[in-house]
């Protein structure tokens, strides 16, 4: 079990202000990201986008090719159906000058399922659209 670290009112207010101040730019960032098709085994351009964004924000970026032979004998490994030859992982790390507090790890994936029949979409799947305060688009 992990202990909760309290967030004081000043820190909470600073976080809320930072979100509000950067909302438009982050929404634009997400829209740019959604415009990049990233179906499974075709994630390269989306990974390049994220790696560049991490570098621009000052993160140390580790971008490496995933070797199937390193994984195939691990417990829980499942069969890969498709071309895994270009599979990569992109990791961004922020290393502060002074270590204070705890670490935070955010992990995710960026591949999306196929779009299906385009005529079933109200808007093109890779063209973000904001409706009722929510962004719609493949991967949003």
What are the roles of these predicted feature ranges?
Residues 2-138:
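Acidic/His- and Gly-rich active-site-bordering loop/insert found
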């Amino acid at each position: 079990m992990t202990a909760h670290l309290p967030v004081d009112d000043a820190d909470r207010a600073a976080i809320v202000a930072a979100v509000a101040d950067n909302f438009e730019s982050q929404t634009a960032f997400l829209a740019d990201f959604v415009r990049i098709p990233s179906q499974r085994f075709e994630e390269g351009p989306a990974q390049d986008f994220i790696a560049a964004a991490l570098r621009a924000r000052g993160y140390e970026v580790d971008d490496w090719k995933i070797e199937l032979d390193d994984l195939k004998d691990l417990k829980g490994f499942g069969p890969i159906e498709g071309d895994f030859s270009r599979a990569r992982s992109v990791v961004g790390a922020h290393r502060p000058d002074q270590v204070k507090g705890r670490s935070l790890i955010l992990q995710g994936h960026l591949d999306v399922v196929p779009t299906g029949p385009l005529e079933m979409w109200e808007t093109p799947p890779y063209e973000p659209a904001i409706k009722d305060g929510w962004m719609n688009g493949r991967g949003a």
